Amino acid sequence: MNKVVLLCRPGFEKECAAEITDKAGQREIFGFARVKENSGYVIYECYQPDDGDKLIRELPFSSLIFARQWFVVGELLQHLPPEDRITPIVGMLQGVVEKGGELRVEVADTNESKELLKFCRKFTVPLRAALRDAGVLANYETPKRPVVHVFFIAPGCCYTGYSYSNNNSPFYMGIPRLKFPAEAPSRSTLKLEEAFHVFIPADEWDERLANGMWAVDLGACPGGWTYQLVKRNMWVYSVDNGPMAQSLMDTGQVTWLREDGFKFRPTRSNISWMVCDMVEKPAKVAALMAQWLVNGWCRETIFNLKLPMKKRYEEVSHNLAYIQAQLDEHGINAQIQARQLYHDREEVTVHVRRIWAAVGGRRDER
């Protein structure tokens, strides 16, 4: 199995292909990407037969920006007979996966695939039973075993394969299912909520998104991102010349500062989070974020970088490299992740966490 399917946002196939070609090449896993515009997926075909498996084992999925999900597959199954689609699929997976922990029958995230998605949901139940009988799936779902993927690109036409549960997206089609809260001031609130799900392990939420933390929201108006912080019982400085939603001000947890987010300087020394979703050139935002991190004005940050029309992967890579270089120059240890989230449009969301080492004679924090 030498092919890797990567699901992405429709319209960003070229960026997804450029990224996987670059990052696979850095690990000396060479191949080429097959790209069909607005299809919502990319196929990276490795030159060596076992390199697909090697790629999804060795390259951290968390290091990918434009891929929502990935899995290794074999040859395309075509012209599945309508009276028995199950037998050929089971045959393709036997000897490839043994006692898989979960089955996902998926499609790309396009308008054309919506009808096909309905079929996938109905088809999952009988296929799961057949795969269990064949030993491809375990008799019960387990998160420690590989995930079996059946990816339909057209009716009667699918790829079959697997991903590793410790190096993939835990979400079906790579998309967290989030509900827009009616009391939130704007739909942008879902970007920050999704970022928390993607970047912060669920078992660390109580510690890292804790009650009583202090946070700053730069470019906050009308308060979509502030809402997520308030919902987690944080105290928030919302920085924007534009007005904040009255519902947020009524909580008593929000201090509205009518200032330019680029000029604001915090006066507190215990700010846990800084978040930022400003419409500005990505290089300018990256420079501001680096300044906050280098000066230790926050422990963690989530921010958006708006993408240009062309060379989007190159632009994001350049901005992330700039932030990393600034941190390195000042001897700061940090973890950087970036992802084009489901709720992002022409942008990517970045998470940076400063990590303080325990050094004798020095406080752990700042």
Swiss-Prot record:
GO terms for MF: S-adenosylmethionine-dependent methyltransferase activity
Cited SUPFAM superfamilies: S-adenosyl-L-methionine-dependent methyltransferases (SSF53335)
Catalyzed reactions per annotation: cytidine(2498) in 23S rRNA + S-adenosyl-L-methionine = 2'-O-methylcytidine(2498) in 23S rRNA + S-adenosyl-L-homocysteine + H(+)
Pfam assignment, any one: RlmM_FDX
GO biological process: one example: rRNA processing
Lineage: superkingdom: Bacteria
Residues engaged in binding S-adenosyl-L-methionine: S188, C221, P222, G223, G224, D240, D260, D277
Enzyme class: transferase
Major location (coarse): cytoplasm
Entry GO terms, CC: cytoplasm
Subcellular location: Cytoplasm
EC number: 2.1.1.186
Catalytic site positions: K306
UniProt cross-references to InterPro entries, sorted A to Z: RlmM_FDX (IPR040739), RlmM_THUMP-like (IPR048646), RNA_MeTrfase_FtsJ_dom (IPR002877), rRNA_MeTrfase_M (IPR011224), SAM-dependent_MTases_sf (IPR029063)
Keywords of this entry: Cytoplasm, Methyltransferase, rRNA processing, S-adenosyl-L-methionine, Transferase
Subunit structure: Monomer.
Family that this chain belongs to: Belongs to the class I-like SAM-binding methyltransferase superfamily. RNA methyltransferase RlmE family. RlmM subfamily.
Function: Catalyzes the 2'-O-methylation at nucleotide C2498 in 23S rRNA.
Matches recorded under PANTHER family: RIBOSOMAL RNA LARGE SUBUNIT METHYLTRANSFERASE M, RIBOSOMAL RNA METHYLTRANSFERASE FTSJ DOMAIN-CONTAINING PROTEIN
Protein name: Ribosomal RNA large subunit methyltransferase M
Lineage: Bacteria, Pseudomonadati, Pseudomonadota, Gammaproteobacteria, Enterobacterales
